[in-house]
Amino acid sequence: MSKEKLKKAREFEQEQLKRISPEERPCYHVTGGSGWINDPNGFSFYKDEYHLFYQYHPYSNEWGPMHWGHVTSKDLITWERLPLAMVPEEAYDNFGCFSGSGIELSDGRHLLMYTGVGYVSDIPMANGELPTHQTQCLAVGDGTDYEKYEKNPVITGEDVPAGGSKVDFRDPKIWKDEDGFYYAVVANMTEDGNSRILLFKSADAFQWQYVCVLDHSDEKLGKMWECPDFYEVDGKHVLVVSPMAMMPEGLKFHVGHSVIYLTGTYDKKTHQFIREDVQPLDSGIDFYAPQSMQTPDGRRVMIAWMQAWPNSKFVPDGVKYFGQMTLPREINYRNGKLIQQPVREIENYRGEYVHYENVEISDETVLNGVDGRVLDMTVKLKVTDTFKKFTIKLAADETYDSTITYDPVREVLSLDRSRSGYMYDILHKRDIQVKPAGGEVTLRILMDRFSVEIFINDGSQTATMVLFTPQEADNISFAADGKAQISVDKYALTF
């Protein structure tokens, strides 16, 4: 790796860090050192720490040639910033070091597997852009410094089976299976504009061979599938993909960029994955490109980019960086669904506690002690025929608010941040089909300074959105059209 280009990028990042105060960042969500970030990458455990890398353009708040930023954590909540890990520089990645994953090798080194995007010609195409291709590459390091593999790329367009694109071939997710072999799933667009997930295999993580097509979109479930993840949890195999150009299906799937998970059976001998069901992974506004890992204590933990692509070109005025990650989430499989919960470590940061039991709500009501922008709050709503609508206002004052509303007749939960202060907000509202569980709708709401993550009915559904509301707007209120009954448990989170 070119020491000079990496040194320049690291020095620039260090200078930019001085411009951004801790108060301008979230308390417990990962952000870039400066500039732009998107997909989480290289999520892994190495040398007694969690490592998270991310797609990174440190030089501006807009997407640009992708670098890899880097943070570490002991507990998945508070993160230490390390020098950025990779810069685009070689012929095979001079357009960008795109998304990938990480794993510890048997010899104790840390391996990063990523997509290198390189120019193949200096003659522009019809759209004025220079043609590129995408290949899979490696970098090996000690947890701080990484060297790109001298024989990169290790998987090229020549390894793509017939009918596949050499241009859209990206986002390798690597793991080591019980048979001692390394495997990687890679997203690939087909010649007809659809997508498929390719499976590759290696004895040493350096020399790879194509195995099979694991699954494909087949003119359904969007076009290009990005950022695949494949794992087993609670006896069920799960394939997670982030489709582009998704078509809506009622309130189940939403239009545009999305994230879905496909559950099924997987034969580890024949490598045949038989799909059984498809569900949305998050039904909110800002959630994309999730990546998971298995923790040393056996939990499956996932993190995602907390941003919507359609809004990403409209950076709010005055923002000194753009993009953040979700809170890591524990994943389980129960009753035919993936269940998501905030990682349990967040509970170690709980402070002041307020509890209300069976409070009747009609007109707009403020509960003493229930306010703030950094909190962990659970609201249990009894679903009866005594109200037509129930609303929670968050991050509110006389000018701003964002709302969570439940309609018990339609069984629809609605998010609305049109009054949040996010100018030019293309996606500002989302409706989600939510059925009561045991006569109640339970909402666990995790707020940070610039986000809201909602875990619905014990994590059977989730909804995520960012907020660019001034921090002074920290009121919370409850209201009902009719009479509703709620219980509230609210913890302030302290850091």
Give, region by region, the residue ranges found by the protein language model.
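Beta-rich carbohydrate-recognition and catalytic domains
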Residues: 1-171, 176-220, 234-283, 306-356, ...
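Short, well-structured alpha-helical interface segments that form or flank functional binding sites
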Residues: 38, 225, 287
